[in-house]
Amino acid sequence: MRLKALVGGGTLSNRRQIIRGLLAVGAFGATSRLWTGCTPTTSPTTGDSPAANPDASSVLAMGFIYVGPKDDFGYNQAHFQGKEGLKGMAEVKTIDQAGVPETTEVQEVMQTMIDQDKVTALFPTSFGYFDPHILKLAASYPQVQFFHCGGLYQEGKHPKNVGSYFGYIDEAQYIAGIVAGHMTQSGKLGFVAAKPIPQVLRNINSFTLGARSIKPTITTQVIFTGDWSLPVKEAEATNSLVDQGIDVVTCHVDSPKVVIETAEKRGIFSSGYHANQSSLAPKGYLTGAEWDWTTVYTEYARLIQAGKTLMNDGIPHLLRGGYREGFVKLSDYGPAVSPEAKKAADKAKARLQDGSLIIYTAGLKDNTGKVVVPKDYGQTAIELESMDWLVEGVIGKIA
């Protein structure tokens, strides 16, 4: 199992607007061979204690910070579950704090974790933590490593003790689209999205391409709410899509909870995002695109325990991964999913894992009829990082 190591970045203005910042990357696809044997550690132990009782000086203390609640059925829950996957790992303890805003408060939390809890590897997971908060603390604590979820690290500009990680979750969205393509009766899908940034557009497009690989006439109606967490607008958007005849809905917002619950109340199918939301829609939940941060956090811990750091270049500063690397996964299929849908999805999943499936193939057009993919683009193609179009079959406009 290998993880992609990128060596560039960019400047972003909106929270979690990750992909736009990778436009200037000069070497996509350089492969780190450090990340091998990525089998998550999931043995149960007490959450904030090491698995055994080794000498305190040998314990690796890892700190995790979330902008929202740990149980939001979304972005923050996915990171919390990744942290929980470290339980049982020898000589590792974890400390975490939820509900920390993207203000100087996160600096105080990081400083407390470093000074009082002796944390030496910090994982502040929200986009807005990076600049200026992580950068300021990193300069003050050069021996502490700061790992940020995003693509913001720039070589030569940012401190050596800062790194970034992210993943190709659009691969899981493509598979979810295949399931949706099998299950829709109307041929109309819906997508509730926060903002038309490249990462969001890539999820919309990959979901649509997966569905249209089953039925080329399928359409995806998209509604942008304008921000990452607007529950009222998310409910309104979902209801509006149902009123327009869609019978499967998915989303890209911080917490899919409202979208999934609204879909269940309206009696349509839903597909999740970030984490598993099946408990919110026992009848209509088909599957979902999930993060598997346990893989990432476990391997970071193993590398650090082996003496590798960002500072000695033992750990790449910018890391990416998808199905093959264990960064993303698909939620378990819901009871409504047909055997044919499962078979098609599993086949595509296997091809993503072995690298034989190309989502963005030569000749793809946007929804205005313009060819936007002149040649096959693999997942690391720099052209996909600046995506500013909606694929053919998507009904909607980028404001």
Functional labels for PLM-detected ranges:
Residues 1-38:
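N-terminal secretory signal peptides
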Residues 8-12, 34-62:
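C-terminal segment of N-terminal export signals and the immediately downstream linker at the start
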Residues 49-399:
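A residue-level marker of the well-folded mature domains of exported/periplasmic proteins
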